[in-house]
A protein has these predicted regions:
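An acidic-aromatic pocket/loop used at catalytic or ligand-binding sites
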Residues: 70, 75-77, 94-100, 137-193
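Active-site-adjacent structural segments surrounding the nucleophilic cysteine of cysteine proteases
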Residues: 41, 161-329
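Sec-dependent signal peptide recognition
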Residues: 2-10
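Long, charged/polar, surface-exposed segments that mediate recognition or autoinhibition
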Residues: 58-139
Length: 442
């Protein structure tokens, strides 16, 4: 009896373990893996989530996911299946990225890259063609392209550093899509985009939509989910690039160029990186407005203005929060009375607020989103947010002049594509606005 019970326990345990693992290759085996249907796949595989309500893609994230996804036996951190006309059009896998997995030894990274390429060669019967390109100083991107049975298999990996002992692995990613001989990546630059593919002004303006209630917004901006890491800046930039027709650059490459850590990066660092390398991506960035606190002097000025207003309103003054040599901006601002800070922003900067309103309307009418850097926690947001306080970056994609509101979107996946708030609330939390414009071929 005890033996039977033990056997049953082992069977149940084996079943449980198997149920918690999924080998993606098995799903894609067959004569035509791109016959996979979106309406059948996601309902059967609940560990994937739609990227957006448009269902242009389904995403798997390993973080806090009970199902462990593998491909050719290698653990997958993130998987995205892209669909067109309800059929699979592209598969993307992140096998390593430092934002999700943290830092690993460079020797281990080299071994991982070699083992994965060997496994893919066995699977496809092709060794592939390897390329390399310079992203920025001490940043080299490598790629291996394999073509087998009219399918393009792309492996990309990169590390940053000058000497081998200093090298920091950045990412290892894989893509699979139908091969198009007229768009062969083996004959193109690995790090510089083809500007003939960038959308024209006329194309972008065609994405503008209008509702009967006066809402004007930009449609067709692809969703990117930053995941649990602080990659909002990189994810916002990836969305803009994809919207402009630039599809070969993702948030991990952008995070590498901006020297981003899992906790994030400042918008100033993004502007600096794009000033140096934006031409490679076919874009140009411009700082339009800034109230961002970047120096001790900036914070001191804000405290002084707030305290002057607090004195007149007979409210409690605030002081800079400092522990040792570290100044805590968030904790300092958390002391402010929300109503008083709103008055400071709206009355003290009314001309800038009016310019903010005009800029949004002008850019949205042209089909151009606004990069929007905010400080969360200053306004009680009515719609779902996954971050309660602190610096964050979003996109403003619309407005309604009738009720003086804006339309915005977050890089948190489905449910965050289309949100609204009053322009006054938006202005209160605004720290910076950035214009990122396309540079199509002439």
């Amino acid at each position: 009896m005890n033996r039977i019970v033990s056997l049953l326990i082992l069977v149940l345990l084996a079943f449980t373990l198997n149920a918690q693992q999924f080998e993606l290759r098995e799903l894609l085996d067959g004569n035509n893996p791109f016959a996979l249907r979106a309406d059948e796949f996601v309902p059967k595989h609940k560990f994937f989530r739609w990227l957006s309500a448009d269902r242009e893609g389904a995403r798997y994230a390993a973080f806090k996911n009970p199902v462990k996804l593998t491909f050719l036996g290698f653990p997958v951190l993130e998987a995205i299946l892209y669909f067109e006309n309800n059929q699979l059009s592209k598969l993307y896998l992140s096998l390593y990225n430092r934002g999700d997995a943290g830092e690993i030894d460079y020797g281990k990274f080299e071994t991982l890259v070699a083992r994965f390429n060997e496994a893919l060669s066995r699977q496809t019967g092709e060794k592939g063609t390897e390329q390399r390109g310079r992203l920025a100083n001490n940043m080299v991107l490598y790629a291996n392209f394999r073509v087998s049975d009219d399918i393009l298999y792309t492996v990309k990996w990169s590390a940053s550093g000058h000497l081998k002992r200093d090298m920091k692995p950045q990412y290892l990613q894989f893509e699979m899509e139908p091969f198009n001989p007229k768009d062969d990546p083996r004959k193109q630059s690995l790090v510089r985009v083809d500007r003939t593919k960038i959308e024209t002004s006329k194309d972008l303006a065609a994405n503008v939509r209008r509702k009967a209630d006066g809402t004007v917004w930009i449609d067709n901006i692809p969703m990117v989910d930053q995941g649990a890491k602080g990659y909002c800046v990189a994810a916002v930039l990836e969305r803009i690039l994809k919207y402009y027709g630039i599809d070969g650059v993702n948030q991990h490459t952008l995070a590498q160029i901006m020297k981003m850590r899992s906790g994030g990066v400042t918008s100033e660092m993004m502007l600096d990186a794009l000033d140096k390398g934006g031409s490679k991506f076919g874009i140009k960035a411009k700082n339009r407005y800034s109230a961002e606190i970047e120096t001790v002097e900036d914070l001191s000025k804000l405290i002084s203005k707030y305290n002057n207003l607090a004195r007149r309103a007979k409210k409690k003054k605030i002081a800079q929060v400092q522990k040792g040599n570290i100044i805590f901006v968030g904790q300092t601002m958390a002391q402010m009375d929300p109503k008083l800070f709103r008055k400071l922003r709206c009355d003290g900067y009314s001309r800038a607020m009016n310019s903010f309103r005009r800029d949004i309307q002008s850019r949205v009418n042209a089909g151009l989103p606004v990069g929007w850097c905010v400080f969360l926690g200053l306004v009680n947001e009515k719609q779902k947010t996954l971050q309660l306080a602190g610096a964050h970056m979003r996109l403003i994609i619309g407005y309604n002049a009738a009720d003086d509101s804006i339309v915005y979107t977050d890089t948190w996946g489905s449910g965050h594509e289309f949100k609204t708030m009053s322009l006054e609330d938006a202005w209160v939390m605004t720290m910076r606005t950035i214009y990122i414009n396309p540079r199509p071929a002439r």
